[in-house]
Regions:
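Short, structured segments at the rim of ligand-binding sites
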Residues: 1-204
Length: 204
């Protein structure tokens, strides 16, 4: 698989959630330092060369607490795939979005699919952020590992769309994902990449 920073992390997450091994080409590791550190903390086995990054989690995933930030921190575009990984980690994880408002609008879809996720307006899992004195929902507590189920969900944007695909990949039944065009807008030839990961997607 190949991709930029967002794509690289997304496909690393896809490989880990499927309990397989994934190799990502074409993204410099210095743009993924925080992501790689986070995945390793969760139990991923990472191998890095000048050409590619390989990840697997044969022993499963551990929970973590992560707050988003601007580069070189854990960038906000990674948090949606991470949220799905958290649903499959054994224990309680915390995600704290500190950069943009309304970045947790995809959570109801994951809840519908069986994810045990609660959202809060409080700052959790990190220092107080600029949303701390607002009513903006920007933190989530995720309890895993959850057995996800197939569902009919609508994907509001590219990041939410990819998280829905990841959740569907480990669900016990097929899912109907609406708004698939968002993924095509944000990822290069995503259906070919999904096929290489062993996912079966039929377009309606």
């Amino acid at each position: 698989l190949a991709g930029d920073r967002l794509e690289a992390f997304s496909y690393l997450a896809a490989g880990l959630i499927s309990r397989g091994e994934v190799r990502v080409h074409g993204c410099s590791q210095d743009r993924l330092v925080t992501a790689i550190t986070t995945l390793a903390r969760m139990g991923a086995q990472i191998e890095i060369t000048d050409e590619w990054i390989t990840a697997s989690a044969p022993s499963g995933l551990r929970p973590a607490a992560v707050h988003t930030d601007t580069h070189p921190g854990f960038v906000t575009d990674w948090q949606q795939p991470l949220m799905v990984l958290f649903t499959q980690a054994d224990g309680m994880s915390v995600l704290h979005e500190t950069v943009f408002e309304n970045r947790l609008v995809y959570v109801p879809a994951l809840q519908k699919m069986g994810g045990e996720i609660e959202v809060f307006a409080a700052c959790l899992g990190g220092p107080a952020c600029r949303f701390h004195d607002t009513n903006s929902v920007h933190s989530a507590v995720i309890r895993g590992a959850s057995k996800l189920r197939g569902a009919d969900v609508t994907m509001p944007d590219v990041r939410a769309g990819f998280s829905a695909v990841l959740a569907a990949a480990v669900a016990d039944q097929p899912s109907l994902l609406r708004g698939i065009h968002h993924i095509e807008r944000g990822y290069h030839r995503p259906f070919e990449q999904f096929a290489s990961l062993g996912l079966t997607i039929r377009r309606g």
